[in-house]
């Protein structure tokens, strides 16, 4: 199907980017990797602008589920929204099981916590990181399809703000915690909607980042994040 093709293309693209842009930075600082990630995202966005142009294109929805009306029409859940929520829950459960109960998942956790120790234990660090990028790219493709299906439009800059908010949700919920990322995204979405409804349409996004700053000041590890223990 078309979705499988999109997913495969994004997976391969993610692995190529990892090999070209991130593998040379294995021993670099986290800040260097973050700056590289921002640079790569802008590079891909501008390449898409050159190839496809800035004009929005229609994106047909693949969801055939009818909308559901609740509370006498005060709340309407579209089919795309229902599928997105269900997909997020399923992906969270699968990823949690994968990282907790499979050999490769445990290897990913080991590499993320202590790369040098993981390598000494016989874990293939490069292969593990490449697999992580492949899984992340595949999930990004699924998220992109769900996003474009919801708004029925597609353009090179469509994923800019959602990408920033996704990173914000991960930090909000706790880096390294899969349920935390889902919880962070849910809470940020509620804050944004309530802010736009009761405060100001223009300040909706600003409120999201303001709440993030407050949470990080109070609990730097995020809502479900665990503090790192320094070994002496």
Describe these PLM feature segments:
Residues 21-22, 43, 117-118, 171, ...:
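Hydrophobic/aromatic residues within transmembrane alpha-helices
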Residues 3-5:
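Short, small-residue-biased leader/transition segments that mark boundaries at the very start
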Residues 74-154, 178-184:
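Helix-loop-helix "hairpin" substructures at the membrane interface of multi-pass membrane proteins
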Residues 141-142, 155-175, 186, 190, ...:
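Hydrophobic alpha-helical segments embedded in the membrane of multi-pass proteins
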Residues 24-101, 128, 194, 199, ...:
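Transmembrane helix-bundle core of multi-pass membrane transporters
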Residues 1, 27-31, 178:
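Membrane-helix interface segments
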Residues 8-13, 38-48, 87-96, 137-143, ...:
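Hydrophobic core segments of alpha-helical transmembrane domains in multi-pass membrane transport
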Residues 10-28, 180, 184-185:
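Transmembrane-helix boundary motif in ABC transporter permease subunits
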């Amino acid at each position: 199907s078309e979705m499988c093709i999109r997913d495969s293309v994004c997976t391969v693209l993610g692995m190529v980017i990892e090999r070209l842009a991130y593998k040379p930075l294995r021993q670099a600082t986290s800040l260097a990797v973050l700056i590289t990630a921002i640079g790569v995202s802008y590079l891909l966005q501008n390449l898409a602008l050159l190839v496809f142009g800035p004009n929005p294109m229609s994106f047909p929805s693949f969801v055939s589920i009818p909308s559901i009306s609740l509370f006498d029409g005060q709340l309407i859940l579209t089919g795309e929204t229902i599928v997105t929520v269900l997909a997020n829950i399923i992906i969270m459960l699968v990823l949690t099981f994968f990282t907790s109960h499979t050999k490769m998942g445990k290897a990913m956790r080991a590499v993320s916590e202590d790369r040098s120790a993981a390598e000494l234990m016989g874990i293939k660090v490069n292969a593990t990181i490449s697999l992580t990028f492949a899984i992340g790219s595949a999930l990004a493709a699924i998220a992109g399809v769900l996003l474009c299906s919801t708004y029925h439009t597609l353009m090179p800059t469509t994923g800019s703000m959602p990408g920033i908010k996704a990173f914000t949700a991960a930090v909000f919920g706790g880096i390294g915690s899969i349920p935390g990322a889902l919880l962070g995204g849910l809470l940020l979405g509620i804050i944004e909607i309530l802010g736009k409804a009761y405060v100001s349409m223009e300040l909706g996004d600003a409120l999201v980042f303001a709440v993030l700053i407050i949470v990080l000041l109070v609990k730097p590890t995020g809502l479900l994040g665990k503090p790192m223990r320094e070994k002496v």
